[in-house]
Amino acid sequence: MNKLEERSQHRKSRFRFLVISTFWRVLLLLKNDAEPLFHLGNIHYAYGHKASAMNYWKEAVSKNREHEKAWHNLVQCAVIQEEWEQAAEGLTILCRNHPTRFEYMSLYTHALKKLGKKEELEEWYLSHINGPHHEWAIEGLGMLYIRTRREIDAFKLLSPFVRKFPNRPVGLKILGISSIRTNQYEAGLTFLEKSLELKEDKEVKSLVDRVKRLKKVRGGNR
């Protein structure tokens, strides 16, 4: 995401802070709309007052739900403060207004993960599997299926995907894990080794080593 609209050019003097904030407070009395609140949030953030900055941006978006710069800043500050409910609320607005902007999509995904909202996360990925970022959505959904022990769903989703995109390490990783969990060890090992060739991954390497050890044990018991 772009940096916060923090007006970093303001020098960190108490006097300057008072002058600028007073200007916007007077304008707020005259206009009583979102714009002075937005700028008050900016100046407070620039001088390190994150809590009051967030409050001003919240007031700004309560007056104008379509004030994108205020939402943008509020979301970034909420992420920094790890206030994920607030971040998710703002990102629903930003994603609605910019449905193909990947930085908002991926950050909203991160917020849903932090909140543990698995059903909403599944719906979110499903809503994008036919869009411009379908590779990301399919791999994200597949990984969600793996994490929630839905290996068969992951296998069905990733099998045609890997045939179409055979050189994507994450897709190969998901298909490899789902194959192993459904007792297709040889196929799973092949997918995981191919994934590892394309991208170093400690989890994949650990799985490959584990499957190879299991094969040796089984071979020795014959």
Swiss-Prot record:
The protein, known as: TPR repeat-containing protein BH2049
Gene3D superfamilies reported in the protein's UniProt record: Tetratricopeptide repeat domain
InterPro entries linked to this entry: TPR-like_helical_dom_sf, TPR_rpt
The organism's place on the tree of life at top rank: Bacteria
Keywords: Repeat, TPR repeat
TPR repeat ranges per the UniProt record: 34-67, 169-202
